[in-house]
Every structure is written in C-alpha cells, then in structure tokens.
C-alpha cells in the first residue's frame, strides 16, 4: 500500500502504535520482519483470533483507555467489528487484497464511539 511507511512514521510521533495480527506465530513473525514496518510499533501482538475478548485483553494489558483507542484495519470481521464490540473506535481502510473470509458488513459504531471509513491508508494523517 502506497505511503504506509510515511504514514506510520507520522502516526508514531503522535501516538502509541501496537501491531495486532492473527495467525501462526512463526509465519506472522516472519511477515512482520519482512515487511520492514516493525520499527514503527511500540509492541506487536500475534494472536490466534481477533475478537472482542482479545481486544478487551489487549486494552487491559497495555492500559489503554478505550475512549481514546483506535483500531485501524482492513477486515470488518477481525479488525473493525470486534474492536467496536470491545468499546474501541475504529478506522476501516478497505483493501482489494483482503482475504474473502474476512469480508462482512461493517457494523455501525455504538453510541459514544466513532467509525471512520477511509479510501487510502495515507488519509490517516488527515484525522490523527
């Protein structure tokens, strides 16, 4: 995705970034290393499943205030909907290469929460 390193560099100077991905530990660790993006994150978490319980647990682990924590992702099923269910805000950045099993309707944000839908990852700089 264009402008990802520049956008992450911008965001990390203003916010604490935590990478959360799901899958097999060895496979995901390798992908993170090969991406060259690990340096932009203060922590990385590889989980078996990304659901609201996991987001609750991570918010506790990292002492995140849910009212000011955002999940940014391209999967309604694993990123956006469970984050909203866990009381977080969410930014949906659709991507054409998102695995078909991750597709589902994006839920509306519950009262008191926000949902942004962006066309490009670089647009995050306009909001954060």
Task: Give each language-model segment a name.
Residues 5, 9, 16, 24-128:
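Asp-based, Mg2+/Mn2+-dependent phosphohydrolase catalytic module
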């Amino acid at each position: 995705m264009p402008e990802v390193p520049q956008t992450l560099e911008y965001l990390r100077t203003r916010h604490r970034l935590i990478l959360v991905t799901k899958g097999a530990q060895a496979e995901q660790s390798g992908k993170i290393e090969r991406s060259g993006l690990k340096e932009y994150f203060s922590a990385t978490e590889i989980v078996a499943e990304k659901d609201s319980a996991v987001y609750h647990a991570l918010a506790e682990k990292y002492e995140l205030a849910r009212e000011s924590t955002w999940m940014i992702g391209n999967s309604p099923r694993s990123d956006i909907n469970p984050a909203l269910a866990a009381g977080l805000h969410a930014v949906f950045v659709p991507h054409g290469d998102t695995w078909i099993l991750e597709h589902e309707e994006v839920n509306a944000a519950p009262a008191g929460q926000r949902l942004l839908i962006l066309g490009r990852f670089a647009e995050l700089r306009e909001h954060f």
